[in-house]
Amino acid sequence: MNTDTSSPETAPSGVLLVHGAWHTGTAWDGVAAGLRARGIPVAVAELHRGSLAGDIAAAEAALDELAGSGPAIACGHSYGGAVITGLPAGRIAHLVYLAAMMPDIGETSMGLLAGAPPSDLRACIVGDFTGITTIDPERAGPLFHAQLDADSRAEHVTKLVPQVMAPGYEATTTAAWHARPSSYVLCTDDRAVHPDLQRRFGTRATHTITWNSDHGAFASHEADTVELLARLAAPAG
């Protein structure tokens, strides 16, 4: 755990948003709009590159879209946490893990899930766990968005896409949270990533924040997510 809690003397270059498995960058539409309305530059990574290394490279390329030259706030949701963990620490001002994987060097996302108390995730996955999978559309809403109304839940489910499982079995080779401050957002109503596993990750973070949220906190707690990221993106002073 990095214990540096100081804020940057100048504003970070912006906020990088990294989606989770079975999702795309559209998951962040509301959060991105909220940040941009406050004048905060935003870059949204698009993953699904077939490997953890490829997804990390895609996220780093998204960092290049930010106009500022300084380090950025990187926020990863779910599997996206493994991606931001692998980013070069020198390009990151603060890491935010939103109900996310927070692996250490040598750990894999699938290994961490297998070693945790069972959630509803495995029963909702359709397909070959070593190949390409989807989420059962009848179960996806309650799994990811239990706190949304039926219409909003259905809208988010239509955005889900197939997921290559290989990145989940790839070991983390570098962990930026050892070198940069981090915040872990623990979602206590999460049915996909068990809250007990999230508590374990919270012990690795500089700060732990607890929300009574489902897995898709970017939607059910959109305003809270915007507020957290905007605060971190503001310069000290």
Annotate each language-model stretch with its function.
Residues C75-G80, I84:
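Gly/Ala-rich beta-loop-alpha elbow adjacent to hydrolase catalytic centers
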Residues R91-P137, V164-G168, V193-H194, R200:
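Flexible "cap/lid" loop of the alpha/beta hydrolase fold
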Residues E155-A176:
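Active-site nucleophile elbow and catalytic-triad environment of alpha/beta-hydrolase enzymes
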Residues C187-N212, G216-A219, R231-L232:
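Conserved loop-alpha-helix segment in the C-terminal half of the alpha/beta-hydrolase fold
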